[in-house]
């Protein structure tokens, strides 16, 4: 974009794709050039074009026919045949000849496409000039160049378009050509193809079974729920396709793969299993396998998730893709993730393990800002559950939400840290968990403080609540399952007044309503504190935010939580700070 393509790259592109078994077709010369090369003196002209540096070619294109003539006359001096051939063209025709490259020649393109009539992947390297047909053609700065009014008028006149008719669909073609083109377009396969009906929704059970265990991690709960679905069978399990960038075992996908197998076009037995070598992984590969294993390639991972998540509109068959990746390495594939969401692809992304709670593996494997990625990415709804039953509720919701016309892709941020589970009196909390948060310890009306927690530090938050509740009567503990949804709804409420609609109460406002107007909030999560600290702005409350805002390190969990101020003592200190403000 910023200049001309480096000459050395063309052969490099060939090598890369040919090594991978692709057919490479180079379209350098258009039909007019090839016909001219066949005439006396043409071989010398062809050799000159083939050896001309790209930058020189671009500059001459911008300078025009006279510059072409001067340069060619000087370089081909001593070749009467070539000079005679050049002399047959006036300046305008010479410029047209020299810029008749393969990528601008319709006949050349059609012939090349028609010749590739098999299923071998093919790379077309088509030579072009930047800004072809415009006054800025060939100039290295034309990526940011803007044509002035006079240049626009000249372009319009050269195309035979009358002033004021620039936006007419067939403008400048003439009646006969327009009639023929209209008929061609109307009869084309794209115009005649009917839009595929939306495929039926894959039924999702009313509830997912909650994995048993007094103490468990959200990552383990996720893996167990997927395993139970795989074992139970049914349409939902049959439509799930899993993938991971070489972290299948360490993200608890292994059980699902044991049940459903690896996808492979040619069947391949598990050699370790055949040799009776003990292994928890029993990975046979076959055409009906439902797991696609990738190397350490997060960009490919997100490209695959996006493609699988578009199966419904593309092929009329709905798939439910589930991809797991170490949470910090979401950042490696952000471009592919962004464009997948831009295309409204539907998938379940599981980022795990997350945060400094992955204490033993050090800062390179400990995520910090992924909650903010989840909040800021359009087309992606993010959740961070704390308990196994929340994982079950949110996974069930995700498989349903992914299929709704007004739904989106879903991101679950999970952890390998086991936490004690809580006993529920009823299921009333579930609807609020799906909306973004619920009171785990209900505050008294008019309470002056609350602890707001998200994710795996729930144990520290509960311990702090136990210690503080006598000193702070009515203290509440708010368990946020989705900073993303709370913030999104709050923002939409404020935007509504400017869009002509009446502002509607948002979930964050409703949750904080029982607290006193001057109440203080201690917010805490194993991630960027910015994911929760904004909650003070909902009702104008003071905030003492806790979280991670610098790289992690290797250590045991208590030491790391103490160092990064995520432990119970830090929450108590933050609560005390509220009343010193």
Predicted regions mapped to residue ranges:
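Thiamine diphosphate
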Residues: 1-168, 171-581, ...
């Amino acid at each position: 974009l910023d200049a001309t393509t480096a000459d050395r790259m063309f052969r490099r592109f060939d090598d890369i794709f040919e090594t991978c078994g692709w057919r490479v077709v180079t379209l350098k010369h258009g039909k007019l050039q090839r016909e001219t090369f066949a005439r006396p003196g043409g071989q010398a002209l062809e050799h000159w074009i083939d050896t001309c540096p790209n930058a020189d070619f671009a500059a001459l294109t911008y300078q025009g026919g006279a510059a072409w003539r001067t340069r060619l006359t000087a370089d081909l001096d001593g070749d009467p045949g070539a000079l005679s051939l050049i002399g047959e063209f006036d300046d305008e025709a010479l410029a047209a000849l020299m810029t008749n490259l393969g990528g601008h020649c319709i006949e050349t393109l059609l012939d090349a496409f028609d010749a590739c009539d098999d299923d071998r992947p093919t790379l077309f390297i088509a030579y072009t000039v930047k800004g072809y047909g415009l006054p800025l053609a060939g100039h290295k700065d034309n990526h940011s160049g803007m044509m002035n009014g006079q240049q626009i008028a000249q372009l319009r006149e050269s195309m035979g378009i009358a002033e004021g008719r620039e936006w007419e669909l067939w403008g400048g073609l003439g009646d006969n050509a327009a009639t023929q083109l209209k008929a061609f377009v109307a009869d084309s396969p794209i115009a005649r193809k009917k839009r595929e009906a939306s495929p039926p929704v894959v039924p999702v059970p009313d509830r997912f079974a909650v994995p048993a265990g007094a103490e468990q991690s959200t990552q383990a709960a996720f893996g167990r729920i997927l395993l139970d679905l795989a074992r139970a069978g049914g349409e939902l399990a049959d439509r799930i396709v899993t993938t991971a960038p070489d972290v299948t075992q360490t993200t608890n996908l292994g059980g699902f793969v044991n049940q459903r197998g690896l996808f492979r076009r040619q069947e391949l037995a598990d050699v370790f299993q055949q040799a009776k070598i003990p292994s928890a992984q029993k990975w046979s590969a076959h055409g009906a396998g439902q797991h696609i294993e990738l190397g350490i390639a997060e960009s490919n991972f997100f490209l695959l998730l996006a493609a699988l998540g578009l199966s419904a509109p593309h092929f009329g068959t709905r798939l439910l893709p589930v991809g797991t990746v170490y949470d910090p390495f979401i950042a490696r594939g952000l471009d592919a993730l962004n464009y997948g969401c831009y295309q409204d692809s539907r998938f379940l992304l599981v980022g795990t393990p997350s945060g400094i709670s992955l204490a033993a593996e050090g800062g390179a494997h400990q995520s910090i800002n992924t909650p903010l990625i989840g909040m800021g990415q359009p087309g992606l709804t993010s959740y961070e559950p704390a308990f196994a039953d929340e994982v079950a509720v949110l996974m069930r919701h995700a498989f349903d939400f992914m299929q709704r016309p007004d739904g989106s892709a879903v991101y679950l941020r999970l952890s390998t840290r086991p936490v004690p589970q809580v006993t529920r009196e009823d299921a009333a909390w579930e609807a609020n968990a799906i909306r973004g948060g619920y009171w785990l310890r209900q505050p008294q009306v008019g309470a002056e403080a609350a602890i707001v927690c998200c994710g795996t530090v729930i144990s520290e938050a509960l311990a702090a609540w136990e210690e503080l509740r006598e000193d702070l009567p009515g203290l509440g503990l708010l368990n946020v399952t989705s900073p993303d949804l709370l913030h999104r709804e709050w923002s939409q409420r404020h935007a509504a007044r400017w869009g002509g609609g009446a502002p509607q109460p948002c979930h964050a406002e409703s949750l904080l309503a029982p607290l006193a107007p001057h109440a203080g909030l201690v917010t805490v999560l194993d991630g960027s504190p910015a994911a929760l600290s904004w909650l003070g702005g909902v009702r104008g409350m003071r905030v003492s935010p806790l979280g991670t805002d610098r790289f992690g390190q290797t250590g045991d969990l208590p030491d790391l939580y103490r160092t990064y101020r995520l432990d119970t003592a830090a929450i108590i200190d933050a609560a005390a700070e509220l009343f010193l403000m």
